[in-house]
Regions:
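Chalcogenol-based redox active-site neighborhoods
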Residues: 1-152
Length: 152
């Protein structure tokens, strides 16, 4: 289990254009790293659109927003285009970052047990350390909660 104050696990994953993006690319900037289950599903779409609506606020605070799911690059391209998402989406089909951040967990729905991404957001400081962990966030309010936290 990751803890506040520890080094955030490094990753290198493709973005929606196939470019490899690493967490270390953003040393010197704060990073909002949000893990979500699936492109184009109701909760994930609301969460992404809320981040898009708040994007200028993140930029004004020199904060990079990165969304990660196990969806394909093509899925991310379509998702970003459909909803005009201005931030980085990374594809993690091999669960590299998803597992290293501990968000691939058992889920229960109507008595059925499966594994999937538990919607979780990490705020990573300018030195690459975990500053805040927000587990099981609400998709509609996650972006606003982070902006409030950053403004404190």
């Amino acid at each position: 289990m990751l803890e506040v104050g520890t080094k955030a696990p490094e990753f290198s994953l493709p973005d929606k254009d196939g470019n490899i993006v690493s967490l270390s690319d953003f040393l010197g900037k704060k990073v909002v790293l949000y893990f979500y289950p699936k492109d184009n599903t109701p909760g994930c779409t609301r969460q992404a659109c809320a981040f898009a609506a708040a994007y200028e606020g993140f930029k004004a605070n020199n904060v990079v927003v990165i969304g990660i799911s196990k969806d394909s690059i093509t899925s991310h391209q379509k998702f970003a285009q459909k909803y005009d998402l201005p931030f980085i989406l990374l594809s993690d089909p091999e669960l590299q970052a998803i597992q290293s951040y501990g968000v691939w967990q058992e889920k229960k729905l109507y008595g059925k047990v499966s594994y999937g991404v538990v919607r979780t957001t990490f705020i990573i400081d300018e030195l690459g350390n975990i500053e805040k962990i927000m587990p099981k966030v609400k998709p509609d309010t996650n972006a606003a909660e982070i902006l409030r936290y950053l403004g404190e």
